[in-house]
Amino acid sequence: MSSTTAFRQGIYQFDWARRVVRWLDAMPNAALAVEVAPDRVAAARWSRTGSLDGYAVESLPVGALAPSAVEANIVNGAAVKAAVTNVCNHLDSQDEDVAMILPDTVIRVFVQHFEDFPRSAAEAVPMLRWKLKKSVPFEADETLISYMRQAPRETGIDVVTALARLRIIREYESLVEGIGLHPGVVLSSSLAAIALVEDEKPTLLARVSGSTLTTAIVRRGVLCGYRCTELPAHGVNLKPQMLLEEIFPVAAYYQDTWQEAIQSVRVAGLGTRLAEFVRPLEEEFHCDVRSLLHSAVSDGRIKEDARPLAERDLEGLIGWMLQRG
C-alpha cells in the first residue's frame, strides 16, 4: 500500500483501552518493526504468539539523521542505510511487511474539538485540511492526513488528526524498500510508546528524545492533549525547569478543558538523570511521578521476554509489541 493510500484511506485508530495506535484500518500484524531515531536504528521481531524473537540496535553517527516535518531528514544516507540493513539482516528479514516507527517531529498530531463533525471521510478530510492548512508549512497536495473521531463529550466531539509530508515519509519507507521489505503501518515513536501508559486516571507522558520533548495526556481511552516541541537544551544541559516550562501549556489546557488535575506523570528518555526531575514534577503536579518503562515493568505490562528492550530504553518498539497483540 502506498503512503498516500495508507494515510488518506486509513483512520488513526486510538483505541487506548485496547492499547491500539495504527495508521491503517486493518489490525496491525507485522511481525517486524523498525524504529529510526536520531542516534540509532533498532528493529525487533515477534513470534505468532507475541513473544520477542529477537532484536538488534545500531548506533548512528552524530548528525546522520535530522528529524523534521519539512526538510529532508537523512543527512548521511550511507550510514542510515547501513544501520537499517544491518539490524534487518540480523533478524533475517526478507520480503515481508514491516512497521515503521519514526521520530515524533516527522508526524504532526493535533487534538481538536468540534461541535459537529462529518461522518464521511469525503467531507471530513477537506474540512481538516482547511482548518489545519496554516499549521503545516507545506502544500496541501504534499500532505498526508489521517484522523480519528474519539468518544463524544457532553457537547461535541474531539478529533485526533495526524499530518505528514509525503516526501519525508517516502525517505523512511525507501530505507526498507531498498532491502526488499514492504512498509505498511507508519507511526511516531511516542504514539507507539503511549501503549505503555496506564490511563484509568488522567496521566501525562513526558518523553524526551534528543532535543525533542513530546507531551501527551491520556484519560480513559481518550487522547486529551498532545504537543511536540524542541527543548532549549538537551543532554546534561537540560534542567528540570526547562522541561516544566514546555510541559505546562499541555497540562494547563487539559486542566482548563476537562476541569480536573493531572493525577499521574510518566517520564521517558531521561535515563540516569530521571531522579533530578522527579521532585520538581511532583511539586508541580502533586501526584505520582515515575519512569514509563519502570512502571510498566513493575505493573506487569511488559512481559519477561521483552525486558531486554526495556533495558535499552526502546519504549517505541515495546509499545508496538503491545499494540499488535
Question: Residue locations for each model-derived region?
Answer:
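Hydrophobic/aromatic-enriched cytosolic interaction surfaces used to assemble or bind macromolecules
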Residues: 1-325
